[in-house]
Protein backbone atom coordinates (compact mmCIF):
# COMPACT_ATOMS: atom_id res chain seq x y z
CA UNK A 1 0.00 0.00 0.00
CA UNK A 2 2.93 2.28 0.69
CA UNK A 3 5.13 2.75 -2.39
CA UNK A 4 8.78 3.75 -2.45
CA UNK A 5 9.31 7.47 -2.56
CA UNK A 6 12.55 8.17 -4.40
CA UNK A 7 13.72 4.69 -3.51
CA UNK A 8 12.80 4.97 0.21
CA UNK A 9 9.94 3.20 1.96
CA UNK A 10 7.53 4.98 4.31
CA UNK A 11 5.18 4.04 7.15
CA UNK A 12 1.68 3.21 5.92
CA UNK A 13 0.17 4.90 9.00
CA UNK A 14 2.06 8.14 9.69
CA UNK A 15 3.81 8.50 6.33
CA UNK A 16 7.29 9.01 7.79
CA UNK A 17 10.20 7.88 5.60
CA UNK A 18 12.48 4.99 6.55
CA UNK A 19 15.26 7.48 7.21
CA UNK A 20 13.07 9.46 9.63
CA UNK A 21 12.35 6.60 12.05
CA UNK A 22 14.44 4.14 14.02
CA UNK A 23 12.76 1.00 12.65
CA UNK A 24 10.37 0.24 9.78
CA UNK A 25 8.64 -3.13 9.95
CA UNK A 26 7.49 -4.64 6.64
CA UNK A 27 4.34 -6.65 6.03
CA UNK A 28 2.50 -7.80 2.92
CA UNK A 29 2.54 -4.56 0.88
CA UNK A 30 2.41 -2.40 4.08
CA UNK A 31 4.94 -0.91 6.52
CA UNK A 32 4.71 0.33 10.11
CA UNK A 33 7.33 2.33 12.01
CA UNK A 34 8.45 1.81 15.61
CA UNK A 35 6.71 5.03 16.72
CA UNK A 36 3.31 3.83 15.48
CA UNK A 37 3.88 0.43 17.10
CA UNK A 38 4.54 2.12 20.46
CA UNK A 39 1.48 4.33 20.04
CA UNK A 40 -0.78 1.35 19.23
CA UNK A 41 0.65 -0.60 22.15
CA UNK A 42 -0.14 2.24 24.54
CA UNK A 43 -3.72 2.49 23.25
CA UNK A 44 -4.29 -1.26 23.66
CA UNK A 45 -2.86 -1.26 27.18
CA UNK A 46 -5.06 1.66 28.21
CA UNK A 47 -8.19 0.03 26.79
CA UNK A 48 -7.35 -3.31 28.39
CA UNK A 49 -6.84 -1.75 31.81
CA UNK A 50 -9.89 -2.03 34.09
CA UNK A 51 -11.67 1.28 34.63
CA UNK A 52 -10.27 3.10 37.63
CA UNK A 53 -13.03 3.55 40.14
CA UNK A 54 -10.92 5.24 42.78
CA UNK A 55 -12.91 5.45 46.02
CA UNK A 56 -16.25 5.97 44.32
CA UNK A 57 -17.57 2.60 45.55
CA UNK A 58 -16.61 3.16 49.17
CA UNK A 59 -19.49 3.36 51.64
CA UNK A 60 -19.56 6.11 54.32
CA UNK A 61 -18.18 3.84 57.11
CA UNK A 62 -15.30 2.82 54.83
CA UNK A 63 -14.54 6.45 53.95
CA UNK A 64 -14.57 7.41 57.63
CA UNK A 65 -12.33 4.44 58.46
CA UNK A 66 -9.64 5.79 56.12
CA UNK A 67 -10.11 9.31 57.50
CA UNK A 68 -9.57 7.87 60.99
CA UNK A 69 -6.11 6.70 59.94
CA UNK A 70 -4.96 10.27 59.29
CA UNK A 71 -7.32 12.56 61.23
CA UNK A 72 -7.69 12.17 64.99
CA UNK A 73 -10.86 13.39 66.70
CA UNK A 74 -13.57 15.45 64.96
CA UNK A 75 -15.79 12.34 64.78
CA UNK A 76 -18.99 14.15 63.81
CA UNK A 77 -17.31 16.14 61.04
CA UNK A 78 -15.75 12.99 59.60
CA UNK A 79 -19.16 11.33 59.57
CA UNK A 80 -20.79 14.34 57.87
CA UNK A 81 -18.03 14.54 55.26
CA UNK A 82 -18.15 10.80 54.56
CA UNK A 83 -21.88 10.92 53.86
CA UNK A 84 -21.64 14.11 51.78
CA UNK A 85 -18.83 12.73 49.62
CA UNK A 86 -20.52 9.34 49.25
CA UNK A 87 -23.74 10.98 48.08
CA UNK A 88 -21.83 13.26 45.71
CA UNK A 89 -19.98 10.49 43.90
CA UNK A 90 -23.02 8.20 44.03
CA UNK A 91 -24.82 10.97 42.16
CA UNK A 92 -22.04 11.04 39.55
CA UNK A 93 -21.94 7.28 39.20
CA UNK A 94 -25.66 7.15 38.49
CA UNK A 95 -25.93 10.38 36.49
CA UNK A 96 -26.83 8.48 33.32
CA UNK A 97 -29.35 6.26 35.09
CA UNK A 98 -31.52 8.71 36.99
CA UNK A 99 -33.45 10.90 34.58
CA UNK A 100 -36.71 11.79 36.30
CA UNK A 101 -35.02 13.33 39.36
CA UNK A 102 -32.10 15.76 39.21
CA UNK A 103 -29.99 15.49 42.35
CA UNK A 104 -28.26 18.72 43.35
CA UNK A 105 -24.62 18.95 44.34
CA UNK A 106 -23.81 19.08 48.07
CA UNK A 107 -20.89 21.43 48.63
CA UNK A 108 -19.47 21.45 52.16
CA UNK A 109 -18.48 24.16 54.66
CA UNK A 110 -16.08 23.30 57.50
CA UNK A 111 -16.11 25.74 60.41
CA UNK A 112 -13.35 25.50 62.98
CA UNK A 113 -10.31 27.21 64.51
CA UNK A 114 -6.86 27.09 62.97
CA UNK A 115 -5.14 23.74 63.35
CA UNK A 116 -8.37 21.80 63.90
CA UNK A 117 -7.93 19.64 60.79
CA UNK A 118 -10.03 21.32 58.08
CA UNK A 119 -7.36 21.19 55.37
CA UNK A 120 -6.20 17.71 56.38
CA UNK A 121 -9.75 16.37 56.10
CA UNK A 122 -10.16 17.72 52.57
CA UNK A 123 -6.73 16.51 51.46
CA UNK A 124 -7.27 13.04 52.94
CA UNK A 125 -10.65 12.78 51.20
CA UNK A 126 -9.00 13.40 47.84
CA UNK A 127 -6.43 10.71 48.65
CA UNK A 128 -9.17 8.23 49.60
CA UNK A 129 -11.14 8.86 46.42
CA UNK A 130 -8.06 9.06 44.18
CA UNK A 131 -9.35 12.18 42.44
CA UNK A 132 -7.52 15.41 41.52
CA UNK A 133 -7.33 17.84 44.42
CA UNK A 134 -6.61 21.57 44.43
CA UNK A 135 -6.37 23.99 47.31
CA UNK A 136 -6.82 27.76 47.20
CA UNK A 137 -6.76 30.63 49.67
CA UNK A 138 -9.83 32.83 49.45
CA UNK A 139 -7.87 35.86 50.67
CA UNK A 140 -5.89 35.99 47.39
CA UNK A 141 -9.01 36.07 45.21
CA UNK A 142 -10.46 39.22 43.67
CA UNK A 143 -13.01 40.02 41.03
CA UNK A 144 -11.85 39.81 37.42
CA UNK A 145 -10.02 42.96 36.40
CA UNK A 146 -8.48 43.70 39.80
CA UNK A 147 -5.06 42.87 41.22
CA UNK A 148 -5.14 39.33 42.62
CA UNK A 149 -6.21 35.89 41.44
CA UNK A 150 -9.31 35.27 39.35
CA UNK A 151 -11.72 32.54 40.36
CA UNK A 152 -10.73 30.68 37.16
CA UNK A 153 -7.21 30.30 38.59
CA UNK A 154 -8.64 27.81 41.11
CA UNK A 155 -9.89 25.66 38.24
CA UNK A 156 -6.47 25.96 36.61
CA UNK A 157 -4.88 24.50 39.76
CA UNK A 158 -7.29 21.56 39.54
CA UNK A 159 -6.44 21.05 35.87
CA UNK A 160 -2.74 21.07 36.73
CA UNK A 161 -3.34 18.49 39.48
CA UNK A 162 -5.10 16.33 36.87
CA UNK A 163 -2.22 16.77 34.38
CA UNK A 164 -4.65 18.73 32.18
CA UNK A 165 -6.97 15.73 31.90
CA UNK A 166 -10.24 17.68 31.68
CA UNK A 167 -12.47 14.67 32.35
CA UNK A 168 -10.56 13.79 35.52
CA UNK A 169 -10.53 17.41 36.69
CA UNK A 170 -14.30 17.63 36.28
CA UNK A 171 -14.69 14.95 38.98
CA UNK A 172 -12.14 16.46 41.36
CA UNK A 173 -12.27 18.24 44.70
CA UNK A 174 -11.43 21.90 45.34
CA UNK A 175 -10.76 23.12 48.87
CA UNK A 176 -11.01 26.87 49.44
CA UNK A 177 -9.60 27.97 52.80
CA UNK A 178 -10.17 31.19 54.74
CA UNK A 179 -13.60 31.63 53.18
CA UNK A 180 -14.65 33.68 56.21
CA UNK A 181 -12.17 36.37 55.09
CA UNK A 182 -14.28 37.14 51.99
CA UNK A 183 -17.32 38.10 54.03
CA UNK A 184 -18.76 41.46 53.10
CA UNK A 185 -17.92 44.34 55.36
CA UNK A 186 -21.51 44.98 56.48
CA UNK A 187 -24.96 43.48 56.07
CA UNK A 188 -26.14 46.46 54.05
CA UNK A 189 -25.19 46.83 50.39
CA UNK A 190 -22.28 49.22 50.04
CA UNK A 191 -22.00 51.98 47.44
CA UNK A 192 -18.27 51.21 47.13
CA UNK A 193 -16.91 48.17 45.32
CA UNK A 194 -15.93 45.29 47.63
CA UNK A 195 -13.66 43.42 45.19
CA UNK A 196 -12.14 41.00 47.70
CA UNK A 197 -15.26 40.32 49.76
CA UNK A 198 -18.75 40.27 48.33
CA UNK A 199 -17.32 40.59 44.82
CA UNK A 200 -15.45 37.29 45.19
CA UNK A 201 -18.55 35.59 46.56
CA UNK A 202 -20.48 36.76 43.50
CA UNK A 203 -17.73 35.47 41.22
CA UNK A 204 -17.77 32.07 42.94
CA UNK A 205 -21.54 31.59 42.71
CA UNK A 206 -21.77 30.15 39.21
CA UNK A 207 -18.59 28.12 39.54
CA UNK A 208 -19.66 26.27 42.69
CA UNK A 209 -23.21 25.75 41.47
CA UNK A 210 -22.15 24.40 38.09
CA UNK A 211 -21.19 26.12 34.87
CA UNK A 212 -18.84 25.80 31.91
CA UNK A 213 -15.83 27.99 32.64
CA UNK A 214 -13.14 29.10 30.22
CA UNK A 215 -9.83 28.41 31.94
CA UNK A 216 -6.58 29.97 30.66
CA UNK A 217 -3.92 27.21 30.78
CA UNK A 218 -1.10 29.73 31.38
CA UNK A 219 -2.91 32.02 33.80
CA UNK A 220 -5.36 34.66 32.74
CA UNK A 221 -3.77 38.09 32.84
CA UNK A 222 -0.26 37.75 31.49
CA UNK A 223 -1.25 35.76 28.40
CA UNK A 224 -4.46 37.33 27.08
CA UNK A 225 -4.30 35.71 23.62
CA UNK A 226 -3.95 32.07 24.68
CA UNK A 227 -6.50 29.36 23.88
CA UNK A 228 -8.92 28.61 26.70
CA UNK A 229 -9.82 25.20 28.10
CA UNK A 230 -13.51 24.58 28.73
CA UNK A 231 -14.23 22.88 32.05
CA UNK A 232 -17.66 21.96 33.41
CA UNK A 233 -17.91 22.48 37.17
CA UNK A 234 -21.22 20.61 37.62
CA UNK A 235 -19.49 17.59 39.17
CA UNK A 236 -16.62 19.27 41.01
CA UNK A 237 -17.05 19.03 44.77
CA UNK A 238 -16.25 22.30 46.57
CA UNK A 239 -15.23 22.20 50.22
CA UNK A 240 -14.87 25.51 52.05
CA UNK A 241 -13.09 26.10 55.33
CA UNK A 242 -12.82 28.99 57.73
CA UNK A 243 -12.35 29.90 61.39
CA UNK A 244 -15.33 32.32 61.47
CA UNK A 245 -14.12 34.12 64.59
CA UNK A 246 -17.07 35.89 66.18
CA UNK A 247 -19.72 33.57 64.75
CA UNK A 248 -20.46 32.11 68.19
CA UNK A 249 -21.51 35.58 69.40
CA UNK A 250 -23.99 35.84 66.53
CA UNK A 251 -25.44 32.43 67.43
CA UNK A 252 -25.75 33.40 71.10
CA UNK A 253 -27.42 36.71 70.20
CA UNK A 254 -29.92 34.92 67.96
CA UNK A 255 -30.91 32.54 70.73
CA UNK A 256 -30.85 35.00 73.60
CA UNK A 257 -34.36 35.30 74.94
CA UNK A 258 -35.66 32.40 72.84
CA UNK A 259 -36.41 28.87 74.01
CA UNK A 260 -35.40 28.51 77.65
CA UNK A 261 -34.05 25.00 77.21
CA UNK A 262 -31.87 25.95 74.27
CA UNK A 263 -30.66 29.14 75.93
CA UNK A 264 -29.76 27.21 79.06
CA UNK A 265 -27.86 24.76 76.90
CA UNK A 266 -25.96 27.54 75.13
CA UNK A 267 -25.10 29.23 78.43
CA UNK A 268 -23.98 25.91 79.87
CA UNK A 269 -21.51 25.33 77.05
CA UNK A 270 -20.57 28.94 76.44
CA UNK A 271 -16.93 28.12 77.08
CA UNK A 272 -16.94 25.35 74.48
CA UNK A 273 -16.89 27.15 71.16
CA UNK A 274 -17.32 24.02 69.09
CA UNK A 275 -20.58 23.08 70.82
CA UNK A 276 -22.02 26.53 70.12
CA UNK A 277 -21.01 26.30 66.46
CA UNK A 278 -23.04 23.09 66.19
CA UNK A 279 -26.12 25.33 66.25
CA UNK A 280 -25.02 27.37 63.22
CA UNK A 281 -27.92 28.31 60.94
CA UNK A 282 -27.77 29.86 57.44
CA UNK A 283 -29.01 33.16 58.86
CA UNK A 284 -25.98 33.26 61.18
CA UNK A 285 -23.61 32.92 58.22
CA UNK A 286 -25.48 35.70 56.41
CA UNK A 287 -25.23 37.88 59.50
CA UNK A 288 -21.49 37.13 59.58
CA UNK A 289 -21.09 38.46 56.04
CA UNK A 290 -21.71 35.69 53.51
CA UNK A 291 -24.33 36.62 50.94
CA UNK A 292 -27.55 34.52 50.97
CA UNK A 293 -26.96 33.18 47.45
CA UNK A 294 -23.53 31.91 48.48
CA UNK A 295 -24.81 30.27 51.66
CA UNK A 296 -27.61 28.61 49.69
CA UNK A 297 -25.09 26.82 47.48
CA UNK A 298 -23.34 25.19 50.46
CA UNK A 299 -26.00 22.92 51.99
CA UNK A 300 -23.69 20.82 54.19
CA UNK A 301 -22.24 22.68 57.18
CA UNK A 302 -20.25 21.06 59.98
CA UNK A 303 -18.09 22.43 62.76
CA UNK A 304 -14.76 21.24 64.11
CA UNK A 305 -13.83 21.71 67.74
CA UNK A 306 -10.71 23.13 69.28
CA UNK A 307 -8.30 20.29 70.03
CA UNK A 308 -7.53 19.48 73.67
CA UNK A 309 -4.33 18.03 75.15
CA UNK A 310 -5.45 14.42 74.90
CA UNK A 311 -6.37 14.74 71.22
CA UNK A 312 -3.12 16.54 70.39
CA UNK A 313 -1.20 13.77 72.15
CA UNK A 314 -3.01 11.19 70.00
CA UNK A 315 -2.23 13.25 66.88
CA UNK A 316 1.46 13.02 67.75
CA UNK A 317 1.50 9.21 67.82
CA UNK A 318 -1.56 7.59 66.20
CA UNK A 319 -1.93 8.68 62.52
CA UNK A 320 -0.15 6.77 59.77
CA UNK A 321 2.02 9.80 59.13
CA UNK A 322 2.21 11.07 62.72
CA UNK A 323 4.93 13.53 63.64
CA UNK A 324 6.64 11.03 65.95
CA UNK A 325 6.84 8.51 63.10
CA UNK A 326 8.10 11.18 60.70
CA UNK A 327 10.89 12.40 62.97
CA UNK A 328 11.81 8.83 63.95
CA UNK A 329 12.29 8.06 60.26
CA UNK A 330 14.34 11.24 59.74
CA UNK A 331 16.68 10.27 62.57
CA UNK A 332 16.94 6.71 61.22
CA UNK A 333 18.38 8.20 58.03
CA UNK A 334 21.28 9.44 60.18
CA UNK A 335 21.53 6.03 61.92
CA UNK A 336 20.07 7.47 65.11
CA UNK A 337 17.35 6.06 67.34
CA UNK A 338 14.79 8.63 68.50
CA UNK A 339 12.64 7.89 71.54
CA UNK A 340 9.98 9.96 73.31
CA UNK A 341 8.51 9.14 76.69
CA UNK A 342 4.80 9.76 77.22
CA UNK A 343 5.42 12.65 79.61
CA UNK A 344 7.42 14.45 76.91
CA UNK A 345 4.66 14.06 74.33
CA UNK A 346 2.05 15.26 76.83
CA UNK A 347 4.26 18.30 77.52
CA UNK A 348 4.44 19.03 73.77
CA UNK A 349 0.64 18.77 73.52
CA UNK A 350 0.28 21.11 76.50
CA UNK A 351 2.55 23.68 74.84
CA UNK A 352 0.44 23.53 71.65
CA UNK A 353 -2.73 24.16 73.65
CA UNK A 354 -1.08 27.13 75.38
CA UNK A 355 -0.08 28.59 72.01
CA UNK A 356 -3.64 28.14 70.71
CA UNK A 357 -2.38 26.90 67.34
CA UNK A 358 -3.96 23.44 67.33
CA UNK A 359 -2.34 20.54 65.51
CA UNK A 360 -0.51 22.92 63.17
CA UNK A 361 1.59 24.16 66.09
CA UNK A 362 2.86 20.68 66.98
CA UNK A 363 5.42 20.62 64.18
CA UNK A 364 6.85 24.01 65.17
CA UNK A 365 7.34 22.75 68.73
CA UNK A 366 8.92 19.49 67.55
CA UNK A 367 11.28 21.36 65.21
CA UNK A 368 12.39 23.60 68.04
CA UNK A 369 12.76 20.64 70.39
CA UNK A 370 14.91 18.55 68.03
CA UNK A 371 16.82 21.39 66.35
CA UNK A 372 20.18 20.83 68.07
CA UNK A 373 20.11 17.07 67.44
CA UNK A 374 19.29 17.56 63.76
CA UNK A 375 21.96 20.26 63.44
CA UNK A 376 24.70 18.00 64.77
CA UNK A 377 23.57 14.35 64.72
CA UNK A 378 27.15 13.16 65.30
CA UNK A 379 27.04 14.68 68.78
CA UNK A 380 24.40 12.22 69.99
CA UNK A 381 25.81 9.76 72.52
CA UNK A 382 25.47 6.08 71.66
CA UNK A 383 23.47 6.81 68.54
CA UNK A 384 20.32 7.37 70.59
CA UNK A 385 18.21 10.45 71.40
CA UNK A 386 15.75 10.17 74.28
CA UNK A 387 13.35 13.07 74.82
CA UNK A 388 11.74 13.47 78.24
CA UNK A 389 9.45 16.07 79.80
CA UNK A 390 12.33 17.94 81.46
CA UNK A 391 14.03 18.37 78.10
CA UNK A 392 10.82 19.75 76.58
CA UNK A 393 10.49 22.30 79.39
CA UNK A 394 14.16 23.33 79.21
CA UNK A 395 14.24 23.71 75.43
CA UNK A 396 10.95 25.59 75.20
CA UNK A 397 11.96 27.88 78.05
CA UNK A 398 15.28 28.73 76.40
CA UNK A 399 13.59 29.35 73.03
CA UNK A 400 11.12 31.76 74.64
CA UNK A 401 13.79 33.82 76.39
CA UNK A 402 15.80 36.60 74.78
CA UNK A 403 19.45 35.74 74.36
CA UNK A 404 21.68 38.11 76.28
CA UNK A 405 24.80 39.73 74.92
Swiss-Prot record:
Keyword Metal-binding among UniProt keywords: yes
Matching PROSITE patterns: CLPX_ZB
This protein's UniProt keywords: ATP-binding, Chaperone, Metal-binding, Nucleotide-binding, Zinc
GO CC annotations, alphabetized: HslUV protease complex
Organism domain of life: Bacteria
GO-annotated molecular function: ATP binding; ATP hydrolysis activity; ATP-dependent protein folding chaperone; protein dimerization activity; unfolded protein binding; zinc ion binding
InterPro entries with a match to the protein in the record: AAA+_ATPase, ATP-dep_Clp_protease_ClpX, ATPase_AAA_core, Clp_ATPase_C, Clp_protease_ATP-bd_su_ClpX, ClpX_bact, P-loop_NTPase, Znf_CppX_C4
Domain ClpX-type ZB: from-to ranges: 1-52
GO biological process, one term: proteolysis involved in protein catabolic process
UniProt-annotated binding residues for Zn(2+): 11, 14, 33, 36
Role played: ATP-dependent specificity component of the Clp protease. It directs the protease to specific substrates. Can perform chaperone functions in the absence of ClpP.
Family membership noted in the UniProt record: Belongs to the ClpX chaperone family.
Name the UniProt record assigns to this protein: ATP-dependent Clp protease ATP-binding subunit ClpX
Lineage: Bacteria, Pseudomonadati, Pseudomonadota, Alphaproteobacteria, Rickettsiales
Amino acid sequence: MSEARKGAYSCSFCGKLHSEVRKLIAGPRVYICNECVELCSGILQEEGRPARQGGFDLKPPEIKQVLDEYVIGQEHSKKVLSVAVYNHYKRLRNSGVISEVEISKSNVLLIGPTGSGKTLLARTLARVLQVPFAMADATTLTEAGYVGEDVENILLKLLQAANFNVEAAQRGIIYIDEVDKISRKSENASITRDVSGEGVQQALLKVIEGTVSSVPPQGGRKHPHQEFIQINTDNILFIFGGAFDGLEKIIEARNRGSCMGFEANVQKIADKRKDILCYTEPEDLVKFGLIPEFVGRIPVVTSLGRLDEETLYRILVEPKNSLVKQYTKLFEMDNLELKFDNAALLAVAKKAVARNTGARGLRAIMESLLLDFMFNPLGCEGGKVVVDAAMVEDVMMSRNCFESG
